[in-house]
């Protein structure tokens, strides 16, 4: 027979629950309630939908910030509305209450354990430790002191319509725009009619936005509607663009004009450090227009699964804004028929800073590899190098490994299984592959002690995935 140990609730917990049940008692007591009781009682009130208690607690909140996002993951729109009603009561007051410290309603999806820290403190009585463990959160300096309340939010526009929480919030903000500042640092557009996107962007201070991801199947005419908003995001640090297509109804002249309108917006983005472009078809033959408008030194540059001309690569190697790159990802760009001299020049230019290099699936063949080896061997800060999906032979692979031997910071290396590993029909010959891995293991360990080297196969025709193997026999790495 199993015996369970029942832990009775602490006196503070019982007092808090009693307070939530008695509205009249709550009104008279909150002004004198110890600060450490507010977070656990607020969680209790929110989960139990004690709306009147929530309104009162918001008005007496003893911290300058209310991080509400972790709590609204619970399906409780009624409790969320009660919090907004409590804020309304505060904003409508002519004179601030003695205890009013609340300045920030934080709806960002941040990794912060505010509620967990305080609930654990409640359980163990370690309130002093809870105060010490709170992490400072960056404010919005551009609006400091202008409005009594700042609302931080991350906008994920992924459905045809907004979720009920965001709809409720934006309607509330729209009706009180003179009393508060809506600050959005991260904007992610994954699918929504642009007329809806436009109405939301008009409510947000675009100068606050630091990260933007657009992952929609937009054609150029839709991109032109977004372009003016991009130019106003003057503090943008990270931009991700995916699946931008050229409509077949757009003439070459129209395409050039649209690309010019879009790329000239980069002249205004003087804080941009990270640029990611995946499956962006309008770059072909126009990369120089974008690069010439960059006014900052990029730290991250990713151009993947795009079609580029050889002239585009030449312009990339000559761009002054890429000389301090830490990450360069050109995976999925077909280079088979191109000279790799521009890539060699590019690697020479970033050798002092480059830490991550991805050249997967570029179709680089044996005769092209030698062009980049001297520059690659001078990338002394490199810690990750990926070269999967390039059809090279055993001799070329050995030559490549011998040139990376002096890269002491290299921790992860990914290479393709050499062509000798495959049969005439293109399928992997397992016995031959095992023999090649054993030969490579002996060769590499004669040269150096690698931290991690993986060899990958071609994509499986059945599952569409690759398999990765390290140098040890029969060891598969997912």
From Swiss-Prot:
Alphabetic keyword roster: Leucine-rich repeat, Repeat
Start-end of each LRR repeat: 99-126, 181-205, 206-232, 233-268, 269-294, 295-326, 327-347, 351-378, 379-403
Any one Gene Ontology BP term: negative regulation of DNA-templated transcription
UniProt-recorded Gene Ontology molecular function terms: ubiquitin-like ligase-substrate adaptor activity
One of the record's GO cellular component terms: cytoplasm
Family: Belongs to the PRAME family.
Entry protein name: PRAME family member 4
Organism per entry: Homo sapiens
């Amino acid at each position: 027979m199993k015996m369970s140990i029942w832990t009775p609730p602490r006196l503070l917990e019982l007092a808090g629950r009693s307070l939530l049940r008695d509205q009249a008692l709550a009104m008279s007591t909150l002004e004198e309630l110890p600060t450490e009781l507010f977070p656990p009682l607020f969680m209790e009130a929110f989960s139990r939908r004690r709306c009147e208690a929530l309104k009162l607690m918001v008005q007496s909140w003893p911290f300058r910030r209310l991080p509400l996002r972790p709590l609204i993951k619970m399906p409780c729109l009624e409790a969320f509305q009660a919090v907004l009603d409590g804020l309304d009561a505060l904003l409508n007051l002519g004179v601030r209450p003695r205890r009013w410290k609340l300045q920030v309603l934080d709806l960002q999806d941040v990794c912060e354990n505010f509620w967990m820290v305080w609930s654990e403190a409640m359980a163990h009585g370690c309130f002093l430790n809870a105060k010490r463990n709170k992490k400072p959160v960056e404010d919005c300096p551009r609006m400091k002191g202008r409005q009594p309340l700042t609302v931080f939010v991350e906008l994920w526009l992924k459905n045809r319509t907004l979720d009920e929480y965001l709809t409720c919030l934006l309607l509330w903000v729209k009706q009180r725009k003179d009393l508060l500042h809506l600050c959005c640092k991260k904007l992610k557009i994954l699918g929504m009619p642009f007329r809806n996107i436009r109405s939301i962007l008009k409510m947000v201070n675009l100068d606050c936005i630091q990260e933007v991801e657009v992952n929609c199947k937009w054609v150029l005419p839709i991109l032109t509607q977004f372009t003016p908003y991009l130019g106003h995001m003057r503090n943008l640090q990270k931009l991700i663009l995916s699946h931008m297509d050229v409509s077949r109804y757009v003439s070459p002249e129209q395409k050039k004009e649209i690309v010019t309108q879009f790329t000239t917006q980069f002249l205004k983005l003087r804080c941009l450090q990270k640029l990611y472009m995946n499956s962006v078809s309008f770059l072909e033959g126009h990369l120089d227009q974008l690069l010439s408008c960059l006014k900052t030194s990029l730290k991250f540059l990713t151009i993947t699964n795009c079609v580029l001309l050889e002239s585009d690569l030449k312009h990339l190697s000559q761009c002054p804004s890429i000389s301090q790159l830490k990450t360069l990802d050109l995976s999925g760009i077909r280079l088979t028929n191109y000279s790799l001299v521009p890539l060699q020049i590019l690697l020479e230019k970033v050798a002092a800073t480059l830490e991550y290099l991805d050249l997967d699936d570029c179709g680089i063949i044996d005769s092209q590899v030698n062009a980049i080896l001297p520059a690659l061997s001078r990338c002394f800060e490199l810690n990750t190098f990926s070269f999967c999906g390039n059809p090279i032979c055993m001799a070329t692979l050995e030559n490549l490994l011998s040139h990376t031997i002096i890269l002491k910071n290299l921790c992860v290396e990914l290479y393709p299984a050499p062509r000798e590993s495959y049969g005439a029909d293109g399928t992997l010959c397992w016995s031959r592959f095992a023999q090649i891995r054993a030969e490579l293991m002996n060769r590499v360990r004669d040269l150096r002690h690698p931290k991690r080297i993986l060899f990958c196969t071609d994509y499986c025709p059945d599952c569409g995935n690759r398999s990765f193997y390290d140098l040890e026999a029969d060891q598969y790495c997912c």
